[in-house]
């Protein structure tokens, strides 16, 4: 069971907005890569195999030379955000491909279009993109892109949000 709860923040919103925009730009880059490689991706049976294939296409390691310049476009992009963007882009393309297949079979209406722009947000999971939640001081540290690097930045929280978190989400 997964639960989510939105909290009001006070702090450097510019850094947070920049981080979200970078995530969305990564998504815009990944969608056509995944769509163009759909035949190879769809041959993979398990979703983790699909994620691994896409990650090999975009991420350099000691044993892998990426086919696309994702790492150059998004230097120091956190692993969790990269994998989150891959999962989101795979879902977008999968939905588009399913809709396209249905349209081709039924031939009704206009053909679906694959949009590259999505106003989505990354999930900030504990340990990956947030840490040090302090209900007493009403603060939390979020990973944001600031001054050319991904750092943890302290944000203030509302008392009611801290109380709700302690009561319902711990």
Show where each model-derived region lies.
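Nucleic-acid substrate recognition interfaces
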Residues: 1-170
């Amino acid at each position: 069971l997964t639960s989510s709860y939105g909290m009001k923040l006070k702090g450097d919103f510019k850094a947070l907005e920049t981080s979200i925009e970078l995530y969305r730009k990564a998504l815009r880059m990944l969608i056509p890569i995944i769509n163009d490689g759909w035949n190879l991706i769809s041959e993979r049976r398990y979703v983790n195999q699909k994620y691994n294939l896409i990650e090999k296409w975009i991420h350099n390691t000691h044993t892998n030379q990426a086919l696309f310049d994702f790492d150059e476009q998004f230097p120091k992009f956190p692993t969790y955000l990269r994998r989150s963007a891959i999962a989101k882009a795979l879902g977008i393309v999968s939905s588009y491909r399913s809709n396209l297949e249905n349209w081709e079979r039924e031939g009704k209406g206009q053909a679906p279009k694959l949009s590259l722009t999505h106003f989505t947000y990354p999930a900030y999971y504990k340990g990956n993109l947030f840490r040090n939640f302090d209900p007493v001081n009403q603060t939390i540290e979020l990973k944001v892109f600031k001054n050319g690097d991904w750092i943890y930045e302290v944000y203030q929280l509302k008392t009611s949000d801290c109380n709700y978190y302690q009561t319902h989400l711990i």
